[in-house]
């Protein structure tokens, strides 16, 4: 099963029907915010007046610094394991031709899709990475910030 949020494909073929991880009610607020913003500029404007750590952690473009400096080959594909709410997914979409993001949580994947809805090169697979069958080969693989969730795998 799949659905599209604007241009982003959400793939539920490997989703168990239960989110394996959640930060709780704050994720509902994050989803509401990304559903109501027009673009990244709106999100940045929201952050100017916000001091709550959770919003800054999930939405600040400062997190792009971790790989913004890297010279990716444009005609490449990237697998992002543990994409969460899409903190750096958009950066990957700008850098390479195809991004496949994987996350345990349907809600976090939905936040990611709304946040990055302008990209037409993004597919998000919802499910446990150990259960997902991927035959595609990738030029790059990212596992940023997933160690803390290793107990869920």
Which stretches of residues belong to each language-model region?
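Conserved alpha-helix/loop element of class I SAM-dependent methyltransferases that forms part
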Residues: 57-75
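Conserved SAM-binding loop of SAM-dependent methyltransferases across substrates and taxa
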Residues: 85-96
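Class I SAM-dependent methyltransferase SAM/SAH-binding core
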Residues: 95-130
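A short SAM/SAH-binding and catalytic strip from SAM-dependent methyltransferases
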Residues: 140-153
């Amino acid at each position: 099963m799949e659905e599209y949020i604007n241009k982003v494909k959400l793939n539920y073929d490997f989703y168990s029907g239960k989110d394996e991880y959640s930060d709780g009610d704050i994720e509902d607020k994050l989803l509401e915010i990304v559903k109501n913003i027009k673009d990244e500029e709106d999100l940045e404007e929201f952050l100017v007046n916000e001091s709550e750590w959770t919003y800054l952690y999930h939405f600040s473009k400062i997190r792009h610094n971790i790989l913004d400096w890297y010279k990716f080959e444009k005609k490449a594909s990237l697998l992002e394991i543990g994409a969460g709410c899409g903190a750096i997914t958009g950066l990957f979409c700008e850098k390479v031709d195809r991004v496949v993001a994987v996350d345990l949580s349907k809600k976090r994947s939905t936040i990611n899709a709304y946040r990055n809805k302008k990209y037409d090169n993004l597919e998000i697979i919802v499910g446990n990475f150990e259960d997902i069958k991927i035959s595609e080969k990738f030029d790059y693989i990212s596992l940023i910030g997933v160690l803390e969730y290793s107990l869920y795998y």
